[in-house]
């Protein structure tokens, strides 16, 4: 309340205290499965632990709780893909080097884009794979809202098929 009113005094000690409170708050949200965080992929575990975290919500409904209620289909789709991958991947990370890869799960790299009809968007998504994995050690997958195709070595999967692919895997195991 004080922060919203803008009348709270600031000091180094209060800033440190504020950081501690926020961390405890974030931990509470994580402990209660409202938010989840993933680390940036790195070959050294200490670097991975120190990396900036990406935050995802356990339910897209929480995206409507904020002040800014404009619908961002790309953010919602990426969050939904996270929810699915988080159920099935033992070590889910993202990659941030020159370009960002949304998810790394075992032997697959995932990019999420609501729509890749625009050539610039398509090239941006493809370039991220090429930049990180020049040796082609991973399977490349782009999850979109409504497109399915195979382009070069990249599988483009519509979200609906992506979900069923993982559900079928779950039934087999």
Task: Give names to the regions the model predicted.
Residues 106-118, 125:
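Active-site ExK catalytic segment of metal-dependent nucleases
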């Amino acid at each position: 309340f004080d922060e919203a009113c803008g009348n709270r005094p600031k000091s180094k000690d209060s800033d440190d205290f504020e950081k501690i409170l926020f961390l405890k708050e974030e931990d509470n949200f994580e402990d209660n499965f409202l938010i989840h965080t993933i680390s940036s992929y790195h070959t050294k575990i200490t670097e991975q632990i120190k990396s900036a975290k990406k935050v995802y919500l356990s339910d897209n409904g929480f995206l409507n709780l904020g002040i800014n209620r404009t619908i961002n289909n790309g953010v919602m789709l990426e969050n939904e893909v996270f929810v699915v991958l988080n159920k099935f991947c033992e070590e889910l990370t993202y990659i941030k080097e020159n370009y960002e890869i949304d998810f790394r799960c075992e032997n697959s790299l995932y990019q999420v884009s609501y729509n890749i009809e625009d050539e610039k968007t398509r090239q941006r998504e493809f370039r991220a794979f090429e930049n990180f994995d020049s040796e082609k050690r991973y399977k490349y997958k782009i999850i979109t809202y409504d497109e399915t195709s195979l382009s070069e070595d990249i599988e483009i999967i519509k979200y609906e098929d992506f979900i069923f692919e993982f559900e079928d895997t779950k039934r087999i195991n």
